[in-house]
Amino acid sequence: MSQSNRELVVDFLSYKLSQKGYSWSQFSDVEENRTEAPEETEAERETPSAINGNPSWHLADSPAVNGATGHSSSLDAREVIPMAAVKQALREAGDEFELRYRRAFSDLTSQLHITPGTAYQSFEQVVNELFRDGVNWGRIVAFFSFGGALCVESVDKEMQVLVSRIASWMATYLNDHLEPWIQENGGWDTFVDLYGNNAAAESRKGQERFNRWFLTGMTVAGVVLLGSLFSRK
């Protein structure tokens, strides 16, 4: 379970870093070479036991959902979605999110004022605000996009040590807080059904349908709020 979580996070962050000309391999081992920063090791140690009694993710390299409750039980006869399809759908949805909210997202990244000592507190504050009113697929996409922006900003400001930490924080949060909702709402199969094959971009062409399923509850004002939480008062 934890490996699938981290694999999705690392793939998305690697993709976002590559869009800015950076390589994940430049930063993935920075934390391991430091002795004064235990956050990543602790997070990775906690991740496997973060969710007690919940089924594994609905991915090809994980067991099929076993004993899931609610309407997700109807997925039993469906083909398991490959991990690669989930990764691709996340990439495409993240790109579409940033394209649609380009100006607000630019404000977010330009207002980040982080240091190695305050980064986790800022990450936690923003993510808690993002999901304050509940979870939906659009907010999960925003969560990944925020993590990607945070990594890029960290590298731009020569704080490469934060990249692997951010990956661990995201994987842990995904396990602890988002996976139960994901399983109760059809698993990653449903996400790929909604977002696969660049569905978000296609839906944007039908403007009246976009807000109904892509970013329900996640407005431009919400994105700006994420940025404002990082501003020094």
From Swiss-Prot:
GO terms for biological process: apoptotic process; apoptotic process in bone marrow cell; cellular response to alkaloid; cellular response to amino acid stimulus; cellular response to gamma radiation; defense response to virus; dendritic cell apoptotic process; dendritic cell proliferation. A motif (BH4) lies at residues 4-24. It comes from the Eukaryota. Widely expressed, with highest levels in the brain, thymus, bone marrow, and kidney. Bcl-X(L) and Bcl-X(delta-TM) expression is enhanced in B- and T-lymphocytes that have been activated. A motif (BH2) lies at residues 180-195. Keywords: Apoptosis, Cytoplasm, Cytoplasmic vesicle, Cytoskeleton, Membrane, Mitochondrion, Mitochondrion inner membrane, Mitochondrion outer membrane, Nucleus, Phosphoprotein, Synapse, Transmembrane, Transmembrane helix, Ubl conjugation. GO terms for cellular component: Bcl-2 family protein complex; centrosome; cytosol; endoplasmic reticulum; membrane; mitochondrial inner membrane; mitochondrial matrix; mitochondrial membrane. Proteolytically cleaved by caspases during apoptosis. The cleaved protein, lacking the BH4 motif, has pro-apoptotic activity. A motif (BH1) lies at residues 129-148. It is a single-pass membrane protein. It is found in: Mitochondrion membrane; Nucleus membrane; Cytoplasm, Cytoskeleton, Microtubule organizing center, Centrosome. A motif (BH3) lies at residues 86-100. Residues 27-73 are annotated as: Disordered. The chain crosses the membrane at residues 210-226. PROSITE patterns: BCL2_FAMILY, BH1, BH2, BH3, BH4_1, BH4_2. The modification Phosphoserine is found at S49, S62. GO terms for molecular function: BH3 domain binding; identical protein binding; protein kinase binding. Signal peptide: none annotated. The BH4 motif is required for anti-apoptotic activity. The BH1 and BH2 motifs are required for both heterodimerization with other Bcl-2 family members and for repression of cell death. Potent inhibitor of cell death. Inhibits activation of caspases. Appears to regulate cell death by blocking the voltage-dependent anion channel (VDAC) by binding to it and preventing the release of the caspase activator, CYC1, from the mitochondrial membrane. Also acts as a regulator of G2 checkpoint and progression to cytokinesis during mitosis. Isoform Bcl-X(L) also regulates presynaptic plasticity, including neurotransmitter release and recovery, number of axonal mitochondria as well as size and number of synaptic vesicle clusters. During synaptic stimulation, increases ATP availability from mitochondria through regulation of mitochondrial membrane ATP synthase F(1)F(0) activity and regulates endocytic vesicle retrieval in hippocampal neurons through association with DMN1L and stimulation of its GTPase activity in synaptic vesicles. Homodimer. Interacts with BAD. Interacts with PGAM5. Interacts with HEBP2. Interacts with p53/TP53 and BBC3; interaction with BBC3 disrupts the interaction with p53/TP53. Interacts with ATP5F1A and ATP5F1B; the interactions mediate the association of isoform Bcl-X(L) with the mitochondrial membrane ATP synthase F(1)F(0) ATP synthase. Interacts with VDAC1. Interacts with BCL2L11 (via BH3). Interacts with RNF183. Interacts with GIMAP3/IAN4 and GIMAP5/IAN5. Interacts with GIMAP5 and HSPA8/HSC70; the interaction between HSPA8 and BCL2L1 is impaired in the absence of GIMAP5. Belongs to the Bcl-2 family. This is Bcl-2-like protein 1. It comes from Mus musculus (Mouse). The gene is Bcl2l1.
